[in-house]
Swiss-Prot record:
Cofactor (UniProt): Co(2+); Zn(2+); Mn(2+); Fe(2+)
The protein's name in its UniProt record: Methionine aminopeptidase 2
Stretches of the chain forming a coiled coil according to its record: none
Residues reported in the UniProt entry to bind substrate: H210, H320
Similarity field: Belongs to the peptidase M24A family. Methionine aminopeptidase eukaryotic type 2 subfamily.
Keywords per UniProt: Aminopeptidase, Cytoplasm, Hydrolase, Metal-binding, Protease
Keyword Endoplasmic reticulum: no
Function: Cotranslationally removes the N-terminal methionine from nascent proteins. The N-terminal methionine is often cleaved when the second residue in the primary sequence is small and uncharged (Met-Ala-, Cys, Gly, Pro, Ser, Thr, or Val).
E.C. numbers: 3.4.11.18
Taxon lineage: Eukaryota, Fungi, Dikarya, Ascomycota, Saccharomycotina
Cell location: Cytoplasm
Annotated stretches, region: Disordered: 63-101
Gene, per the UniProt record: MAP2
GO BP annotation list: protein maturation; proteolysis
Length: 459
C-alpha cells in the first residue's frame, strides 16, 4: 500500500469439442484507499453476469462437451445423425475445483525464497560473503518463512486475478474474487493469524489509491480503464504488500505509463539497502519515471511521479511503520537499517503528479492512540470492540464489517473517526481525466543481501 504525504491457478474455461469420437479428457496521506467514482457505469445485464467468473472461494472449470451433429453412414449408405438435438448437446457441465490451503503444497513449512539482490553500496560488500551472518540470520529470523508464505499466496492470488478479470465485471465481483482466494489459500477468514493484510485496492484512472467497493457499489470495470490492483497478505502479522496495474484496451495506449512505473519501482528496489539514504532512492526513482512520456489522442503527456505518495516500512500488524520511501528527491537523509522490511512502491501520472482525498471512504484502521480516545455512545464502544477483536491494527473496510455481522454502523463509525479512535483513508485522486499507475514490491533487508520476497514471473 502507498503512503501519502500531506494532512492461476488460472480460472480456465475449457471447451472440449466432441465429435462422434470421444475426446481425451490489483499533502502526506497514508495510503489505504478510496475515491469518488470517475464514471458510474451501468451494470451489465443479468445474463452477462451469470457467465462471469465466480467470486467465491472455488474456481469454476467449465467443460463444454459440444456434441456436434455429424453424419454417419448406415450400411445401406444413407446418412444418420446423432439422436440428441444439437441444442441439448451444448449443455455445460460445471465442475467446481476448490482452492486448497497453501500449506498442502508445502507440508514441511518451507516456502519459496524471493529474488536475492546484492546491496548497492561497496561498503556493504563484505555482507554477501559472510556465512556466519547468513547462519545467524536464519536462526534469529524464522519469521522470514511467514513473509515467504504470504508472498507465495500473493503470487497465486494475483495470477488468478490476472487471468480472470475482464471488462464488464463489477468492482465488487473483482474484490470478492481476490479476497476469497486469499482466505482460501491462507485457510483463514479475516483473522489475526493469517489472511487479508488490508482491503484490496482497485483504484481506477485518476484515482491513485484507497478505493475498494462498499456494499451496494455498482461500478463496472470498463475496457479503457487503468486499474491499480493492490493486494495485502499477512501471516502472523507479517505483511506482504505488492501491487500491479492492469489495462484492457486494444491499442495499448497505456503501455509507456505502465513501463515507466514498473521500471521506476525496480529502480527503487535495486537502489534500496542497508545504510542507503531515503533521498537517494527517491532521486533515482524520479530520474527513471520522468524520462518517459505517453501519447493519447494525438497529445503527448509527460509521466510524472506522484510526489506526495511514498513507499514505507512495514511493522508487525502495521502496514505503515515509521519511515517513508520517497519517489522524488526530497532531502531525507534517513538511512535504511538491517532487519527492516519495506514496501517499495511508485506511482506515475499523466496529471498534476499530486493527489488529494476525494469521495466516499471505504478504508479505515485503528489509530495509534485509539485506547486513549474518548468514545461517547455504547454503540460506538461496541463497534470499537468488534474492530479491535477482528482486525487489530490491520486496515479494514466497510465490507469486512458487513462480513462479521455488523449492521447500521455508519453513525457509530463516524463517531469513532471524530473521536480519533479510527483513522479514515478516503480515495486519493489526481486531476480528473488523468491516468495513474502503480507497481510495488516488499523487500526484506537481511544482513547479507536483500530479498525481493514478492517477486514473481509477472513483475
Amino acid at each position: 500500500m502507498a503512503k501519502t504525504r500531506t494532512n492461476s491457478e488460472t480460472v480456465s474455461i475449457l471447451h472440449t469439442l466432441h465429435t462422434n469420437q470421444k475426446a481425451p479428457g490489483a499533502r502526506v496521506y497514508r495510503v489505504f484507499r478510496f475515491s469518488h467514482h470517475p464514471k458510474m457505469r451501468s451494470n451489465m445485464s443479468q445474463d452477462k453476469e451469470a457467465n462471469e467468473i465466480a467470486v467465491n472461494t472455488t474456481e469454476t472449470v467449465v467443460s463444454t462437451p459440444t456434441d456436434v451433429t455429424t453424419a454417419e453412414t448406415k450400411t445401406d449408405g444413407s446418412p444418420e445423425t446423432n439422436a440428441a438435438p444439437a441444442a441439448a448437446k451444448k449443455k455445460k457441465n460445471k465442475k467446481k475445483k476448490k482452492i486448497t490451503s497453501i500449506d498442502s503444497s508445502y507440508p514441511d513449512g518451507v516456502f519459496p525464497e524471493g529474488e536475492w539482490q546484492e546491496y548497492p553500496l561497496e561498503i556493504n560488500s563484505y555482507r554477501t560473503s559472510s556465512e556466519e551472518l547468513r547462519y545467524l540470520d536464519n536462526q534469529r529470523n524464522n519469521h522470514w518463512q511467514d513473509f515467504r508464505k504470504g508472498a507465495e499466496i500473493h503470487r497465486r492470488v494475483r495470477h488468478k486475478a490476472q487471468s480472470s478479470i475482464r471488462p464488464g465485471m463489477t468492482m465488487t465481483e473483482i474484490a470478492d474474487l481476490i479476497e476469497n482466494s486469499v482466505r482460501s489459500y491462507a485457510a483463514a477468514d479475516h483473522t489475526l493469524k493469517a489472511g487479508i493484510g488490508f482491503p484490496t485496492g482497485l483504484s481506477l484512472n485518476e484515482i491513485a489509491a484507497h478505493y475498494t467497493p462498499n456494499a451496494g457499489d455498482k461500478l463496472v470495470l470498463g475496457k479503457d480503464d487503468v486499474m491499480k490492483v493492490d493486494i495485502g497478505v499477512h501471516v502472523n502479522g507479517h505483511i506482504v504488500d505488492s501491487a500491479f496495474t492492469m489495462t484492457f484496451d486494444d491499442d495499448h495506449k497505456y503501455d509507456n505509463l505502465l513501463k515507466a512505473v514498473k521500471e521506476a519501482t525496480n529502480t527503487g528496489v535495486r537502489e534500496a539497502g542497508i545504510d542507503v539514504r531515503l533521498n537517494d532512492i527517491g532521486a533515482a526513482v524520479q530520474e527513471v519515471m520522468e524520462s518517459y512520456e505517453m501519447e493519447i489522442g494525438g497529445k503527448t503527456y509527460p509521466i510524472k511521479c506522484i510526489r506526495n505518495l511514498n513507499g514505507h516500512n512495514i511493522g508487525d500488524y502495521v502496514i505503515h511503520s515509521g519511515k517513508t520511501v520517497p519517489i522524488v528527491a526530497n532531502g531525507d537523509m534517513t538511512k535504511m537499517e538491517e532487519g527492516e522490511t519495506f514496501a517499495i512502491e511508485t506511482f506515475g501520472s499523466t496529471g498534476n503528479g499530486y493527489v488529494i482525498p476525494t469521495g466516499e471512504c471505504s478504508h479505515y484502521a485503528l489509530s495509534e492512540e485509539y485506547k486513549q480516545a474518548r468514545v461517547g455512545t455504547d454503540r460506538a464502544k461496541q463497534l470499537l470492540k468488534t474492530i479491535e477483536s477482528n482486525f487489530g491494527t490491520l486496515p479494514w473496510c466497510r465490507r469486512y464489517l458487513d462480513r462479521v455481522g455488523e449492521e447500521k454502523y455508519l453513525l457509530a463509525l463516524n463517531q469513532l473517526v471524530r473521536a480519533g479512535a479510527v483513522q479514515d483513508y478516503p480515495p486519493i485522486t489526481d486531476r480528473a481525466g488523468s491516468y495513474t499507475a502503480q507497481f510495488e514490491h516488499t523487500i526484506l533487508l537481511h544482513p547479507h543481501k536483500k530479498e525481493v520476497v514478492s517477486r514473481g514471473d509477472d513483475y
